Amino acid sequence: RNLAAGKSVLDLCTYTGAFALHAAKCGARDVVGVDSSEDAISVARKNIELNALKNIQFECADVFEFVSRQTQTFDMVFLDPPRFAPSKGSRDKALRAYYKLNLEALSKVSPGGMFITFSCSHQISRNDFQYMLASVFRKAGRDGQILFQGSQPADHPILISCPETQYLKAFFCKVM
């Protein structure tokens, strides 16, 4: 809750704005949410009104293009893209897309800021995602600390007999 207070926040692949709205409600100084879905952004904007928030804006844009042209840096960046690897055959292409998007997103994090990144692709293992993330930090010439690793909550249980139900990876990183 206190992580966002007084901070600038960028929420990439915001969908209906959950992370962005929560950051704004928790006292973020300014919040920008970006998603490529006009329908999702429309819902996110309605959520601003429902929550009577003033320090938040949403933009409908291709996230890859948005981060490549964005010059501002933020104290906290969330990156929660949709599933990039729907099948085993798409794994390598997905890892390249995760790498590219995470590299661009990391460049928008101010020194000392937080980078919170996710993958919801079962085909990408936690080890693969962490290795990709380490490669991103090296390429960017930055260091970081993983403060927390997460998975899906209890309302999305992991079935022992169905390994694809263990799909969500979350890394909360402090950027040096």
Region locations from a protein language model:
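Rossmann-like S-adenosyl-L-methionine
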Residues: 1-175
